[in-house]
Curated annotation (Swiss-Prot):
Region (Disordered): 311-357
Protein's job: Forms part of the ribosomal stalk, playing a central role in the interaction of the ribosome with GTP-bound translation factors.
A Gene Ontology molecular function term of the record: large ribosomal subunit rRNA binding
PANTHER family associated with the record: 60S ACIDIC RIBOSOMAL PROTEIN P0, LARGE RIBOSOMAL SUBUNIT PROTEIN UL10
Protein's name in the database: Large ribosomal subunit protein uL10
Positions with biased composition (Acidic residues): 325-348
A Pfam match: RL10P_insert
Keyword S-adenosyl-L-methionine assigned: no
Length: 357
């Protein structure tokens, strides 16, 4: 008869699993059925009140953050892989204080929503500066006293001016990536500077079969929008200049071709049965004739008959009148600008007079 080792469970024995654990795994799997996109978020260092506020905002966008034990999260994922094999990569990210996030939102929109929900928070000893922490120039909330030497010992140019403690110039107290020590954290707290950012960060999310990490989602939407607009403009210009008609450019291409044909006909002096073209050709020829006649008149007026000489004279007078009108308009605009400037100065002076009696 086989001897059973001491402490070994009997054959066929199944460890008893708490009912709440079974229920938890079942609910996690149901959420994986209900939502298209499944991911993991980092909850480390988030105060409970703020986390509750973030979860409430996300629920309004049909997005659920579900916290559970890492072991149960793994079990739920593993049991769901037959139906949703694309979720398998998430198993590698279940470590530390993470939670599931279930959503039907586009992952980029979700990332933006989570970033917008973040808030500033005081620094704690041991925190790493997310960027240069700058103490700005100007007055502080402190009365003169021992605080001046505390600020100076921390590396801040503090002085007493007009009965107030003042920082005399912008100063980088902690550089990006450096650890914030206890003394510096206390100084920042006293100065009411909250350099840390607290919020939910995406660790990884699977959407439409693709795994996205946080860095994949951190794009500048404004920059991409500008790039898209620039690309659209280049495509529009290419379509017009290469005469490749599209629904958006056909009218412009036809108008451009018409203008170019008109210019060609006018400049080449090609008479065509079109009133606009013939009018432009005749006007151009008339102008060139007057210009040539004017040049001849400067050398020898007697070379022109009276009718042509009178036409040249009228043309010159018209040109002078136009030039004079343009000069008068320019002077009027300058005078108007000067008057507006004087009115603004008078209003400013009146305001100062009212302020100081």
């Amino acid at each position: 008869m086989a001897v059973k080792a001491k402490g070994q469970p009997p054959s066929g024995y199944e460890p008893k699993v708490a009912e709440w654990k079974r229920r938890e795994v079942k609910e996690l799997k149901e959420l994986m059925d209900e939502y298209e996109n499944v991911g993991l978020v980092d909850l480390e260092g988030i105060p409970a009140p703020q986390l509750q506020e973030i979860r409430a905002k996300l629920r309004e966008r049909d997005t659920i953050i579900r916290m559970s034990r890492n072991t149960l999260m793994r079990i739920a994922l593993e049991e769901k892989l037959d139906e949703r094999p694309e979720l398998e990569p998430l198993l590698d990210y279940i470590e530390g204080p993470v939670a599931f996030i279930f959503t039907n939102l586009d992952p980029f929109k979700l990332y933006k929503l989570l970033e917008e929900s973040k808030a500033s928070a005081p620094a704690k000893p041991g925190d790493i500066a997310p960027e240069d922490i700058v103490v700005p120039e100007g007055p502080t909330p402190f009365e003169p006293g021992p605080i001046v030497s505390e600020l100076q010992q921390a590396g801040l140019p503090a002085q007493i001016q007009d009965g107030k403690v003042v920082i005399t110039k912008d100063t980088v107290l902690v550089k990006e990536g450096e650890e914030i020590d206890e003394k510096t954290a206390e100084i920042l707290k006293k100065l009411e500077i909250e350099p840390m950012e607290v919020g939910v960060d995406i660790v990884a999310i699977v959407a439409e079969g693709t795994l996205f990490e946080r860095d994949d989602l951190a794009i500048d939407f404004d920059e991409y929008e500008d790039m898209a607009k620039e690309a659209a403009q280049h495509a529009f210009n290419l379509s017009i200049n290469a005469a490749i008609p599209t629904a958006e450019t056909a009218d412009v291409i036809v108008a451009k071709a018409h203008t170019e044909a008109l210019n060609l006909a006018v400049n080449a002096g090609v008479p065509v049965p079109d009133e606009t073209v013939m009018g432009c050709i005749l006007a151009k020829a008339h102008g060139e004739m007057l210009a040539l006649a004017g040049a001849i008149a400067e050398v020898d007026e007697e070379a022109l008959d009276e009718e042509l000489l009178e036409m040249v004279s009228r043309s010159a007078e018209a040109a002078e009148r136009k030039e004079k009108e343009e000069e008068e308009e320019e002077e009027a605009e300058e005078e108007e600008a000067e008057e507006e400037e004087e009115e603004e100065e008078e209003e400013a002076a009146a305001g100062l007079g009212a302020l100081f009696g």
